[in-house]
Every structure is written in C-alpha cells, then in structure tokens.
Amino acid sequence: MSEVVAKKPRIPKPDWLKVRAPSGENYTRIKGLLGELKLATVCQEAKCPNMSECWSGGTATFMLMGEVCTRGCRFCNVKTGNAKIGLPAVDPFEPEKVAFSISQMKLNYVVITSVDRDDMPDQGSDHFARTVKTIKKLDPNLIVEILTPDFRGDKNLVIHLASARPDVFAHNIETVERLTPSVRDPRAKYRQSLGVLQTVKEYDPKMYTKSSIMLGLGETDEEVLQTLTDLRAVGCDVVTFGQYLQPTEKHLKVIEYITPEKFKSWQNIAEGLGFLYVASGPLVRSSYRAGEFFMKGIINKNREATPLMDAENTERIS
C-alpha cells in the first residue's frame, strides 16, 4: 500500500499584506486609456498591489517586446518561451506607439521594462533604446526610468541602451548570491547583474542606477548585507526591498513573511551604507511610487541647475 504524501500548506498571509481594491479617478482614467490603446503594463500583468497608488499619482510601468520571455525565473509569472523555437516577432513600430500613447496619458514618471529576448541578435537593446529616445522626443520633461534585462552581460548592449539617456537605469539583483541559481533562470548570474550596473556607472558616473531585492526566500541577514555591500561597490544609487509573494503553485514557495519592522531595519542599514534612496516595505516593488517622487525631485533639481550653468558659461564667453 503506497503512502500518500501530504502537501505542505502555504504560510497564511499576514494582515499587513492585505490591500484595498484599486480605485480613484486617475486610476479609472488610465485603465480606460490602456484598454483603448491596447498597451500592456507590468502593473496589470503582475497584479501589483501598488497599482492604484501609482496610477493615481501619474506613474505607470510598461513592458516592451511582447508578453513572452526567453527566461524562466522561478519567482516570475511572465510567460516563458523557447528561444530556439522562436518567439513572436517584435513590432517594429512599438517605440512610436508606446511613446505616443504615453504622451496621451499625462504621466509624470514612466518606467519602461521588457521581457528578455535572447532570441534576438542584440537581445532587444536597440528596440529598447529607440523607445526611450522616442518618449524623450515627444515629452522632454517626462522622467523615464528603465528596468532592463542583463543582456547576457554584453557591455556594448548595456552601453547602447544607456546612451539613450534614461533618467534612471534599473537592473534587479533580485536575491542574494547563494539563492540566485534556484531563484533566477540559469542564464541570470549574480555577478553578471552587478556587472550591468557597474557598466552603466563606468559609461556615465552621473546616471542614477537602481536595483531591487526580494525578501522571504530563505536568505540570511548576513547575505542581504553582503548583497547591499556588493551593490554599493558598483555604485548603485537606489535600492528597494519588497516581500516575495508566490504567484502560483508552480512557483517558489514563500519561506518567510518579513515584518514591517524588519523592512524598516533594512532601510536604516541601507541608508547607512550610503544609498541615495531606499524604499523598503512588504508591498514595495521595483518601481514603487515613493521612490519615484524622491527621484523626480533630484532629477528636476539637476535639470534646473544645468541650464543655469550653461547660461553662466555663455555670459563668460560673451
């Protein structure tokens, strides 16, 4: 007689992870526009708990190059496709379509991300760069943050995208080094991700870089501290901490729900290490709105200072 092995039950979600249903006038307006323009946002795809808050504040995250990724990270709910078989072709007019649509939405801060496209010769770097340039051309005042793949560590592809002049260049380390092989796709390496952020800083030391760490996957405090140290060593300016939540039964289970107090502790530690800004909380995600408000203030201040310096230089010349 065979034994029946019972499945381990999921750890129940604590009260601090419960959120209200999305609502609000700006949320309704943006949702309607997205439907009309047939645009996909990560906010909707990932069922982000901050969607209502971000949309109400004029912020949204858009995903380029389709809805099928060539990677299969065990925490992510985006569809996975086989690069050898081939994925749906990328729409060559997507940069113009996305840029025009964003210009109609009256956003203050936009985040552009993409699936991994290992099936493309340049892994989508030029398509991504064209999108950023087109958005900037249509609305020079809009703050553009990009959240990028690792481009398999190819420095030339990273630099090509950075040369499009996004205001913030984000690439997520996701988890600590020990857990990376079991959490991320085998092609996604911990040191490779650090290399992406380092390449951006080497290309332009003034470009803001950003990364994100999920907690609750079984990491230790010592490992998280080491990850923060590694990020600072490559000049990363901004870091966010959020609780990992299991999307489906097929994905990695939550090992631990981190308390709000512990998230606050990590914020204090990261700030002490010299990060320009830290967003840390159970519901915080890579592009959390609170961080965007902070970055918006810094970027606008720098933009205001640049014309002033140019004017001073002009006066000296004349």
Say what each PLM segment does:
Residues 53-56, 74, 78-81:
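Short functional micro-motifs and their immediate structural scaffolds
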Residues 1-61, 65, 97-100, 106, ...:
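Auxiliary Fe-S-binding modules of radical SAM enzymes
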Residues 72, 120, 179, 249, ...:
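Glycine/Thr-rich phosphate-binding loops of Rossmann-like dinucleotide-binding domains
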Residues 48, 69, 73-76:
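Short cysteine clusters
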Residues 77-97, 102-155, 161-197, 210, ...:
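Core AdoMet radical
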